[in-house]
Amino acid sequence: MPVDDCWLYFPASRGRTFVQTVWVAPTCPNCCWFPGFLPPVPRPPHVPRVLLRGPRGAVLPASRPSKTLPSSSQTPCPTDPCICPPPSTPDSRQEKNTQSELPNKKGQLQKLPTMNGSKDPPGSYDFDLIIIGGGSGGLAAAKEAAKFDKKVLVLDFVTPTPLGTRWGLGGTCVNVGCIPKKLMHQAALLGQALKDSRNYGWKVEDTVKHDWEKMTESVQSHIGSLNWGYRVALREKKVVYENAYGRFIGPHRIVATNNKGKEKIYSAERFLIATGERPRYLGIPGDKEYCISSDDLFSLPYCPGKTLVVGASYVALECAGFLAGIGLDVTVMVRSILLRGFDQDMANKIGEHMEEHGIKFIRQFVPTKIEQIEAGTPGRLRVTAQSTNSEETIEGEFNTVLLAVGRDSCTRTIGLETVGVKINEKTGKIPVTDEEQTNVPYIYAIGDILEGKLELTPVAIQAGRLLAQRLYGGSNVKCDYDNVPTTVFTPLEYGCCGLSEEKAVEKFGEENIEVYHSFFWPLEWTVPSRDNNKCYAKIICNLKDDERVVGFHVLGPNAGEVTQGFAAALKCGLTKQQLDSTIGIHPVCAEIFTTLSVTKRSGGDILQSGCUG
């Protein structure tokens, strides 16, 4: 009689072979040889020689054997003498791996271990793939896996913020990240454009008011359409979606709990963790009671008024930028440096530009207490803060306090310890291989929760798609985490790709890099006569490698649009000579990169007198 379906590994096959039915053939007591299929393979202790029947009844390698194999049909081992080691005796087996260590009795079926220690054969799972997290990466992986006719389940559940904010399918980027942030950044740019328009002949009233409620209504309407579109796309691709919280309860098993507390248990051959991150709180009196995070800001039903932004991350500076851009009084409280992890030359220029445009900075202070002075929408709050390098304390009153001090991975409450997935105990990040595989072979992870990887939506999408193609499409293409472009949507946008100046010095040595740089003045800004010599371009070249460009940085309008094309060039090995030989498009901001000639080392003048230098 056949045993359960399982996976069996044969070293000589350079891969894995699916065993749908296993038949005992006790001819050679020492090896797993069967005619015409593989060379002799040493047999693990107490695992009998087998003949295999593949999927849909296909016999490996010849015709399907009968359930009782007569001795005349048994083929002796082709090696003479047999090269396989004798099996261990029952007394020598150890306590662990009990599924594979039953006594070997000739002519009797033995229980073989299935992949990853599960008692379930792959064919008996509810799904081929269960994805925990319905963000950009998880959805990309789900839709890609469905192309290969795999049965996929997506579990997505939003734990409400302390203020009760929640949202629909799509994850951080769509609901409380990239999409609403960029739209509100656009609202601020339009405010500046209205001011500039007077110099272009438009008659605009001196007082132009911004309507917060109208903006959030429009933004949330667009987000709602995206949420619906994702659900429709999953349904069309026959991906099962449940609004439920997923938690591992054992190997290949998960419990899904919906918002009413109803639980369902599902099993899958593989799992993908794509749970993302949530904003971090300070752990001080009043932070969760009275403060908001970026998870709350984009759907806030009232104008936040005078706002204190706590933090120096890109989230903090982007939010401070568009809030100031729509006319609000904004202060940023910074513990140490701006934009940690980014090029500090560029970060400081961003800070200077924001200060010149009315955003106040309180540096080297951290909040210690938040108190409510007056309830309301927005109400009034008192903030007490402590200096990071002295005993000085300060107080200030604000209508809204926005916390943007970092984000924590959503990995600590999904039962990873139950199945043995290792995480960084300090950060909650998950270490993975270059194929996004955790230390548990059937569990994978992508996105912001990965240790040492970029926390960017396009990275998660790319990793999710490529993972599904490798698992189900026979691909061997891996996600390339090098030279990934990104943009910080501050009032003066910052686009970059490759190494920061600090990282380049660390990697190659200061004497082995050359930095070419220049200020520039967008033509559109010359007529309203604003922000001359504030936009800035910089490339970092490796002198030991034909001046190959290893870092690209730009401050200016539409920085993301400028950076995207250069990112492709960097991946192709762009050199300074190739940039110099490229004819620029005139008059646009990006052409500055075709004319860079002054190096930082030289100390030459980089100020520009007009759009054409």
From Swiss-Prot:
Entry's EC annotation: 1.8.1.9, 1.11.1.2
Modified residues (Phosphotyrosine): Y245
Coiled coil keyword on record: no
Pfam families: Pyr_redox_2, Pyr_redox_dim
Matching PROSITE patterns: PYRIDINE_REDOX_1
Class in the EC hierarchy, top level: oxidoreductase
Keywords on record: Cytoplasm, Disulfide bond, FAD, Flavoprotein, NADP, Oxidoreductase, Phosphoprotein, Redox-active center, Selenocysteine, Ubl conjugation
Compartments in which it is found: Cytoplasm
Annotated catalysed reactions: [thioredoxin]-dithiol + NADP(+) = [thioredoxin]-disulfide + NADPH + H(+); H2O2 + NADPH + H(+) = NADP(+) + 2 H2O
Function noted in UniProt: Reduces disulfideprotein thioredoxin (Trx) to its dithiol-containing form. Homodimeric flavoprotein involved in the regulation of cellular redox reactions, growth and differentiation. Contains a selenocysteine residue at the C-terminal active site that is essential for catalysis. Also has reductase activity on hydrogen peroxide (H2O2).
Protein name, per record: Thioredoxin reductase 1, cytoplasmic
Species annotation: Mus musculus (Mouse)
Name of encoding gene: Txnrd1
